């Protein structure tokens, strides 16, 4: 695989639903090891970006490169897909499988791994997120918070069948949505710990200021299908840019109108 200092590169990335332009000629780069937050009001297309990066949908126009390789097919149609790991807003666990089977799903594809080794790897990943002795339980036997932790443990699993040996790209879709401040802090810690353990690059989509500020190095502001602002997290905290100021302070007055939000 071609080496690149960029985990992600997009050129004029666009997607339309019928006549509606959801994303309009987006250009950005994510360097190896960087942590990016994509922010903006609901319905601005943030989660759509993650779905494109994860290979769940294809852009209508433009170019996407992950770890230097052009992405032209859905992930399931690729012979040598990149190591992209998506943590959904909801845990997305398979209810009929045990926690060990959910977390170790990718490992079971590798016939060179024994059941004993898979068990050890899964338990190690569960321990990294503070879960012990839950591997034989079903998802509905765990609390919502514990299920969320399981989804983070799953993001620590490396698919050894991948031919590419790049560092992973971790995608977090609204990881703290609807959580109280204490629970949000715990999840933010999990995001940072998962990033450190996986030693990759990450993109977080969030509306929560503490999540944005604690889990990212730089920020992109998305509105109306276009990036309206880009800068470091420190610049985001201090910027008087009208889009950033309105988002940060929850103002009704500004370029993002309530009827659109």
Where are these regions (language model features)?
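A short, surface-exposed alpha-helical micro-motif characterized by mixed small hydrophobic
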Residues: 212-214
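ABC ATPase NBD coupling module
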Residues: 71-85, 109, 115, 238-240
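H-loop/switch region of ABC-family ATPase nucleotide-binding domains
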Residues: 206-207
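Conserved ABC ATPase signature
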Residues: 138-142, 146
């Amino acid at each position: 695989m071609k080496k690149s200092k960029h985990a992600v590169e997009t050129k004029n990335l666009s997607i339309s639903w019928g006549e509606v332009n959801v994303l309009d000629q987006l250009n950005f780069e994510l360097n190896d090891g960087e942590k990016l937050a994509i922010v903006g009001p609901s319905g601005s297309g943030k989660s759509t970006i993650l779905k494109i990066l994860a290979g769940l949908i294809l852009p209508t126009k433009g170019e996407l490169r992950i770890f230097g390789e052009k992405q032209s097919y859905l992930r399931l149609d690729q012979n040598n897909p990149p190591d992209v790991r998506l943590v959904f807003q909801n845990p997305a666990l398979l209810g009929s499988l045990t926690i060990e089977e959910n977390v170790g799903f990718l490992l079971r594809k590798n016939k060179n791994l024994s059941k004993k080794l898979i068990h050890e790897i899964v338990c190690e990943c569960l321990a990294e997120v503070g879960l012990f002795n839950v591997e034989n339980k079903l998802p509905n036997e765990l609390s919502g918070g514990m299920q969320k932790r399981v989804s983070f443990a799953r993001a620590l699993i490396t698919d050894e069948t991948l031919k590419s040996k790049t560092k992973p790209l971790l995608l977090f879709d609204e990881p703290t949505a609807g959580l109280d401040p204490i629970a949000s802090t715990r999840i933010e810690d999990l995001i940072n710990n998962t990033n450190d353990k996986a030693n990759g690059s990450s993109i977080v989509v969030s509306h929560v200021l503490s999540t944005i500020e604690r889990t990212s190095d730089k920020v992109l502001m998305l509105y109306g299908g276009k990036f309206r602002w880009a800068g470091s997290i420190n610049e985001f905290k201090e910027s008087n840019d009208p889009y950033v100021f309105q988002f940060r302070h929850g103002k009704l007055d500004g370029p993002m109108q309530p009827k659109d939000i």
